[in-house]
Amino acid sequence: MPDPATYRPAPGSIPVEPGVYRFRDPHGRVIYVGKAKSLRSRLTSYFADITSLAPRTRQMVMTAGSVEWTVVTTEVEALQLEYNWIKEFDPRFNVRYRDDKSYPVLAVTLNEEYPRLMVYRGPRRKGVRYFGPYSHAWAIRETLDLLTRVFPARTCSAGVFKRHKQIDRPCLLGYIDKCSAPCVGRVSAEQHRQIVLDFCDFLGGKTDRLAKDMEQQMTAAAEQLDFERAARLRDDISALKRALEKQAVVFGDGTDADVVAFADDDLEAAVQVFHVRGGRVRGQRGWIVEKSSEPAATGDADLGQSGQEQLVEQFLTQFYGEQAELGSASDTGGDEATNPVPRQVLVPVLPPNADELATWLSGLRGSRVSLRVPVRGDKRALAETVQRNAQEALAQHKLKRAGDFNARSEALQSIQEALGLADAPLRIECVDISHVQGTDVVASLVVFEDGLPRKSDYRHYAIREAAGDGRSDDVASIAEVTRRRFLRHTSDSQPDPSAEQRPRRFAYPPNLFVVDGGAPQVNAAAAVLEDLGVDDVAVIGLAKRLEEVWVPSEPDPVILPRNSEGLYLLQRVRDEAHRFAISYHRSKRSKRMTASALDSVRGLGEHRRKALVAHFGSVARLKEATVDEITAVPGIGVATARAVQEALGVAPQNGTAPDPAPGTGDPQTPADPHSAATAADIEDDRHATGATGPQMNGSEQQVDRV
């Protein structure tokens, strides 16, 4: 582990202006990004007394190998640069609020002819309005179940809508009047869009007008003795009231605000946000994050921040920066209810740079944003409610963490002691091979960090050299995967620490590399690492049945106690690698078993393959077809037709006159079928017939994701 004294900059060389700084590890990867009103005061405080730093901050300083900085002119500029760098480099020691793709929202696809209401997770899209986020998907479905009685808009997928349109019969929701059934023409596209717009107005807070309109319609229907319609409107009004009861009014003045609260301990913090739009709570979300405290120092206001002030600043910059980007990709329709940055943000404390934060948020919103601490009235009462939610979330997490964290720490320490490692194996990678009698030989690589799976770093491999033609060599396969994995690591390494490049997924080498197998497998992996010059990664093998831990060049295995937490962790890692390898093997085998002879035709994409089979009914009938019959299929030219016949092993038919052979002027000399269907000819076919651009078939897709 690097010594901070080896890279500590001289205090006189650090500027006193505001700026943004980056800590890098010995491999040159950015591990932490921060900003400061005075770079000299902030950076000096990191090295003044290492023991006084917070545990996570101390670990960061001990892990780093260099520090660099960029001077800016204003704190607003520093906020923006800090946010951009955190997003670009994804530093491992920065707090990240990652939930934008996991929290569900209610999406309304206004960009379609018949807009649809649906539960959605993922990046925002143009032409779609979003309401939420909701804490659970069932909350959205419950809302839809209530409101589709009043606003019978379409909720089905495009495939279901198309199928019912073809059979001219509505789905069950159409029969029970929870859908206006535009698929069968019960309402026109304009009428259905108006239903959807009324639905959006209701969720946007325009509830009083809709309720009054429905009451007037109910009264008019009763006066006209249309009691059936009046009763239906009465039930619809009741449904609206029930929906409104679920969104109680918290601000009588119709305020749009986000109410933020924190509860923290020495290691972690719970964050809770209530989204209030139109005076009603429209959504709620929460996080549990690891604290990354800045060191305190004297003589600089922004270094005297409390833990809560730092949490507020980190949350505002990261959360609203992400939300503004998501909102810019969606269609908010100018509706205040769906604006990702509200007029007010209510926080428990104001950080020293509150004015700069408010200016930055105003720039994201496009109008003034007020950053305030509620002190009385309804806003103070709601802030206390959010605070209680944060405290409850942290208490529940600590109960779970107490068991999980202690067990994981004990497991890592047990492995370290049993294998004689210098440090605990915080990052463990495991390789497993999967095949059936030498066919579809694949490998998996799974990653565990701090004893927990990191699925974003999982990889699978199609074995290229050590398998094929029904043969399989597990030892050679392990060696191949090890070589490919660590070749990627060495190629990703940045010799120049100043290189401006975001680290890839495998920028960090593992502390422990586990292979599924015994002495032969682990010795093969160790030999590869030695060839590549990788000497800072420990390698072991975990043999099945007896659960023996094999170490390279050792005649006897290491036996961990059966009740050892370290053995349990290694088993979980091995079993996860086994599961991931089997799932990929099954997928690959399924694709092979359902492969068609047409897959090998170069330039013939999936759509044209399906068109051929649909036209002739089967590949057997396609074999019997002439070139003229094949070219009758839209998008298929003569060259492609001949390539199809060649792939199917069919001799050239006389259904059409052959082209002259290249280089001869004799039109009666038949061209070589291999030269007739070149890739260029097939490409010409596609352009000549108006077919779509080149498509990659299944056999040409890159299987190896690494």
UniProtKB/Swiss-Prot annotation:
Any single Gene Ontology cellular-component annotation: cytoplasm
Biological process according to GO: nucleotide-excision repair; SOS response
Major subcellular site: cytoplasm
Region (Disordered): 651-706
Compositional bias (Polar residues): 692-706
Keywords, in A-Z order: Cytoplasm, DNA damage, DNA excision, DNA repair, Excision nuclease, SOS response
Family, per entry: Belongs to the UvrC family.
Described purpose of this protein according to its UniProt entry: The UvrABC repair system catalyzes the recognition and processing of DNA lesions. UvrC both incises the 5' and 3' sides of the lesion. The N-terminal half is responsible for the 3' incision and the C-terminal half is responsible for the 5' incision.
Subunit structure, as described in the record: Interacts with UvrB in an incision complex.
Protein name, as recorded: UvrABC system protein C
